[in-house]
From Swiss-Prot:
Residues 1-415 are annotated as: Catalytic domain. The gene is SULF2. Binds 1 Ca(2+) ion per subunit. This is Extracellular sulfatase Sulf-2. GO terms for molecular function: arylsulfatase activity; calcium ion binding; glycosaminoglycan binding; N-acetylglucosamine-6-sulfatase activity. Expressed at highest levels in the ovary, skeletal muscle, stomach, brain, uterus, heart, kidney and placenta. Residues 1-24 form the signal peptide. It catalyses: an aryl sulfate + H2O = a phenol + sulfate + H(+); Hydrolysis of the 6-sulfate groups of the N-acetyl-D-glucosamine 6-sulfate units of heparan sulfate and keratan sulfate. Residues 416-715 are annotated as: Hydrophilic domain. Residues 560-588 are annotated as: Disordered. The keyword Secreted applies. Processing by furin produces a secreted form. Glycosylation at Ser-583 negatively regulates its N-acetylglucosamine-6-sulfatase and arylsulfatase activities. Glycans are attached at residues 65, 112, 132, 149, 171, 198, 241, 561, 583, 608, 717, 754, 764.
Amino acid sequence: MGPPSLVLCLLSATVFSLLGGSSAFLSHHRLKGRFQRDRRNIRPNIILVLTDDQDVELGSMQVMNKTRRIMEQGGAHFINAFVTTPMCCPSRSSILTGKYVHNHNTYTNNENCSSPSWQAQHESRTFAVYLNSTGYRTAFFGKYLNEYNGSYVPPGWKEWVGLLKNSRFYNYTLCRNGVKEKHGSDYSKDYLTDLITNDSVSFFRTSKKMYPHRPVLMVISHAAPHGPEDSAPQYSRLFPNASQHITPSYNYAPNPDKHWIMRYTGPMKPIHMEFTNMLQRKRLQTLMSVDDSMETIYNMLVETGELDNTYIVYTADHGYHIGQFGLVKGKSMPYEFDIRVPFYVRGPNVEAGCLNPHIVLNIDLAPTILDIAGLDIPADMDGKSILKLLDTERPVNRFHLKKKMRVWRDSFLVERGKLLHKRDNDKVDAQEENFLPKYQRVKDLCQRAEYQTACEQLGQKWQCVEDATGKLKLHKCKGPMRLGGSRALSNLVPKYYGQGSEACTCDSGDYKLSLAGRRKKLFKKKYKASYVRSRSIRSVAIEVDGRVYHVGLGDAAQPRNLTKRHWPGAPEDQDDKDGGDFSGTGGLPDYSAANPIKVTHRCYILENDTVQCDLDLYKSLQAWKDHKLHIDHEIETLQNKIKNLREVRGHLKKKRPEECDCHKISYHTQHKGRLKHRGSSLHPFRKGLQEKDKVWLLREQKRKKKLRKLLKRLQNNDTCSMPGLTCFTHDNQHWQTAPFWTLGPFCACTSANNNTYWCMRTINETHNFLFCEFATGFLEYFDLNTDPYQLMNAVNTLDRDVLNQLHVQLMELRSCKGYKQCNPRTRNMDLGLKDGGSYEQYRQFQRRKWPEMKRPSSKSLGQLWEGWEG
């Protein structure tokens, strides 16, 4: 072959190689959704890192430099990530199932949290079950659900290391593959963050060594920064001047334009503010171990060669607030600090360092994990896969045009709690007035004729009374007038039905008298009942106008024998009727005690029968008012408990079962078979009574539960709790690791029983608002483009038509099921809502594009800080 032909061959080979390389380059970018063939696994590994109570608004991510370097600089940061409920167990249930709270029915951290109903209906349909059935090596490490007791291993997990109950860092119990494992307080062996990190790394390495071609799914669920905020010893001195939590809404209280708990929460006291500073510091310290954990996992993926074939997701179950709006700490509010969470994704085909403005939710995690694994997403999941949002959509050349902007949701539901009773049609007026105080509602009810009589009407259940302070109250009617209907019904039932359906239990050889015989024998022998005290009586309790007074007796009253007048229906002695009026002053004997008696956390009764309180109560009018209000609440609570106990005692006296006469065949036994209808159903009279008994038993169970809580608080000297409020007491013994709290105990309330709400959060190119409806009928609306920290409720600026349209949208979200119903698409903003309304009439801002939707920094809020005092 000559030189010219040789040169021609070389030139042809060069051109062919260039064309082939270009073709390979084009095909690589056009098919970038597919994984490279030289990887060991066809399907990628998935690692979900979940933290507990981690905020975004208070700057917790600012100190996690390792995590931000790995996830933010090396992956995608979703700047509009939210949860659909700011509660631990409901949010975690949504993460596992991909469903809204109203579809998995876990409304609180107690109700239906890891219950048998949850296990039967929803736990068998988590993302772990689907991936485990298709060959994934699944593993869970850390906190699961608040009420998980370790009695079983949830389905779908090959490796299970689950924390029992709520978050702890020391002295906890794990369920390791069905075996309970207790841990102590040794940092090197027991610190939970490090332990689950080491276990997860060991599991991943072992899986890749034994099953190199099987993908791995791991969930690493940290307890940090949840309480009790125990940090690792090496980080206990960091952040002495932490102040990221001091936002414009910090100590912004009271808020008369917001819902109930916000209106009655005043500014924090100095001890509360000092607590918030230390709490923020300790939370950041616990996150340092999570930061180390992320670096350890990253290095493990690099060493095993699985980094480029692994999706890593970092997020939290909900946010947190520390001092915002005067609330010392907590979550459960529908505001940004409680529903915004960190959300980072790193993995194949994810552009490094990008900011994604689309709304992502906790319900999107389950469908996203299924989509990454190549599985079909069940239609009953409410969330959507965000995998398509991670596609960079970069054009290959100028002839490859960019695709149309992806259609994505612009609104979602935020819900907490459920409405136990349906609202009546006549209560719609409460929404129009936005709020009707309780005293006003009671006052309106007392205007009705049926509540003005003193329980004299047949079937009357309530009466209106006025207490000593002139305050109107509704009291429940008790006695024959209210029970007339039920007693008339019970008289129609034969006597043998009162004995119940259970057979008598008789002891052989024992002869028992009838009820009349026992009473006759009791009176004849002057028998002393077992409940009569044999010792002298030194004081008696007298109830006057619903209040209980303990009156001391000068001379010890001797116990009396029971006489015939003690039985129901017997005439009272004349002496008892002429007792005269009772006076609570004078005639009381001197009482001496060895030590002062602690009545409240600030007041004592001394040996000389005088009361002594803290000096602050005598100097500060506000402290005096607060403590007096606290004592009034305690007295009212105890009085209600005593009334309930007396009602139960009276019921038990009337419903005492009669003993059986075992030597005589009763009429009930002889005719037992005749009294039943076909199909073994109960007699209709008895059936009606049985349904009433069930209702009564449910009420009794609730009363007993409240009584147990009351007794427990009294035993623990807990005088912090208020009726209808969720409160906590903090003292020097709460934190067992440095830095320690040394400023003494204090009480604070964080939420209320009526804090049930449904909200719609909307973010798009033109709108950025939150609209809420509370169970009390209260409405809230915040325009976050003009009020990013939700300082002012702007619901009064909206027209009635706009409110109605927002209400319709919210009701649709509250009842949605499946991703087709629960993900409303972006609407035409020129037309407003889909019903034809327009937002232009109340918008006070100009349209903004996505890059301008970022939250303003603290430096740009100088005007808000002027004149503000923390």
